Amino acid sequence: MVVRPYNDELRYLEKVSDHCWRIKKGFQPNMNVEGCFYVNSRLERLMLEELKNSCRPGAVGGFLPGVKQIANVAALPGIVGRSIGLPDIHSGYGFAIGNMAAFDMNDPLSVVSPGGVGFDINCGVRLLRTNLYEKDVQPVKEQLAQSLFDHIPVGVGSKGIIPMNARDLEEALEMGMDWSLREGYVWAEDKEHCEEYGRMLNADPAKVSMRAKKRGLPQLGTLGAGNHYAEIQVVDEIYDKWSASKMGIEEKGQVVVMIHSGSRGFGHQVATDALVQMEKAMKRDKIETNDRQLACARINSVEGQDYLKAMAAAANFAWVNRSSMTFLTRQAFAKMFNTTPDDLDMHVIYDVSHNIAKVENHMVDGKERKLLVHRKGSTRAFPPHHPLIPVDYQLTGQPVLVGGTMGTCSYVLTGTEQGMQETFGSTCHGAGRALSRAKSRRNLDYKDVLDKLDQLGIAIRVASPKLVMEEAPESYKDVTDVVDTCHAAGISKKCIKMRPIAVIKG
């Protein structure tokens, strides 16, 4: 790797608009396409500082700076369009988190890279609405937080309480939310409001290792640790009244529940297993990449297909997982308010994934092409009238759920036609880290973080308080900056803003 002085690096970066920078070819070796990243002035400073720090002599660190990672992805075989960094981008394994890239399915050299999906396959967000208002929940929020904490298993080693044996797991991996529906954990209409209807049809549990299944079996219906949470939120601001009403959000003060979780240790194992296989495939097929972490395989190779089938099974696991937590959340609310989930109108507004690779059709250079779209820390955001979004949202565009961090706001956005053209129908997924986990632990004290939430009037239940500072708002970029940048750039549109009143965390 060549270390160039910072000013030389800057020659390859060009600001093309208030919210978008271009990364020219040559910034990293063998780039097949250009890169770009979306930022506002504050986020831009973070991106460039990260690059500047990596140019210092003797700068050794964990991951490469995000800008470099975007450019390395642009050098992968078969990539089309541009390698795109969204405003919440931060460096990660192989691909930066907040990087999306699309590969031409008809190009025999095109690759699939597990680093472009991430270890927590189908980590995603689900939003439930209620007909309760802040005034109904405020007096009982502590009990409600406790009740959710008791109902939903949380934390690193948490085990599920949804009864599950090995055969059930096989079926759940293949069927996704259809399994949850059959077992009575979700309502039929929940599926309609899920990306992929909660089931990837190419899932093949036979492509998943025993070890992954062993890790996954006890964890179904659990929240996990890290940035995963269940939050009781209040609608704070409505930017697009008409679209919000189509989602069942009529006015400020309405209570919603957001669940953010993924495929737990199961997805992690699937990714780990695939990386081992792909290293072999790269040697055999002589695939060169700029970064070892970008291990990949030709989409049409046995390894590529096996990974996509196992990844789909992990995605199904995550949908079943969020569905099980939906069930537990509905139970907790119904018990608290002495009624039924139905009477509380606890419908799923939408469920989106932000770590996944999917086959989609997009326009490239004026022609429609079949692409494998990698989204890592990036959310699908299809425009109005797109055939893959549910009937209820045909006129609004697909809802996009953007989770904030503990104690900060979350947003619902909608997809736009411009996003379809510029970013393959993708937008941001959250706040994006500004400090690494290790730095957060060194710089922040968990007691201060919890006190601050208390002062904000947020009830909190945490399984592992020592991990709290990793997730403190100070560790992240400002989610409002991120969402506003996407809105201003036109790749998604702001619809609703929510603020938390209770947080349940791993």
From Swiss-Prot:
Co-factor binding details: Binds 2 manganese ions per subunit.
An annotated Gene Ontology molecular function: GTP binding
Residues reported to bind Mn(2+) 1: D120, C123, H228
Record-level GO cellular component terms: nucleus; tRNA-splicing ligase complex
Pfam families the record matches: RtcB
Catalyzed reactions: a 3'-end 3'-phospho-ribonucleotide-RNA + a 5'-end dephospho-ribonucleoside-RNA + GTP = a ribonucleotidyl-ribonucleotide-RNA + GMP + diphosphate; a 3'-end 2',3'-cyclophospho-ribonucleotide-RNA + a 5'-end dephospho-ribonucleoside-RNA + GTP + H2O = a ribonucleotidyl-ribonucleotide-RNA + GMP + diphosphate + H(+)
Binding site for Mn(2+) 2: C123, H260, H354
GO biological process, one term: positive regulation of tRNA processing
Active site positions: H429 (gmp-histidine intermediate)
EC number per UniProt: 6.5.1.8
Residues reported to bind GMP: 227-231, 354-355, 403-406, 410, 429-432, 505
Keyword hit for Transmembrane: no
Subunit and interaction comment: Catalytic component of the tRNA-splicing ligase complex.
Function: Catalytic subunit of the tRNA-splicing ligase complex that acts by directly joining spliced tRNA halves to mature-sized tRNAs by incorporating the precursor-derived splice junction phosphate into the mature tRNA as a canonical 3',5'-phosphodiester. May act as an RNA ligase with broad substrate specificity, and may function toward other RNAs.
Further remarks about this protein from its record: Ligation probably proceeds through 3 nucleotidyl transfer steps, with 2',3'-cyclic phosphate termini being hydrolyzed to 3'-P termini in a step that precedes 3'-P activation with GMP. In the first nucleotidyl transfer step, RTCB reacts with GTP to form a covalent RTCB-histidine-GMP intermediate with release of PPi; in the second step, the GMP moiety is transferred to the RNA 3'-P; in the third step, the 5'-OH from the opposite RNA strand attacks the activated 3'-P to form a 3',5'-phosphodiester bond and release GMP.
Annotated protein name in UniProt: RNA-splicing ligase RtcB homolog
Organism listed in the record: Drosophila melanogaster (Fruit fly)
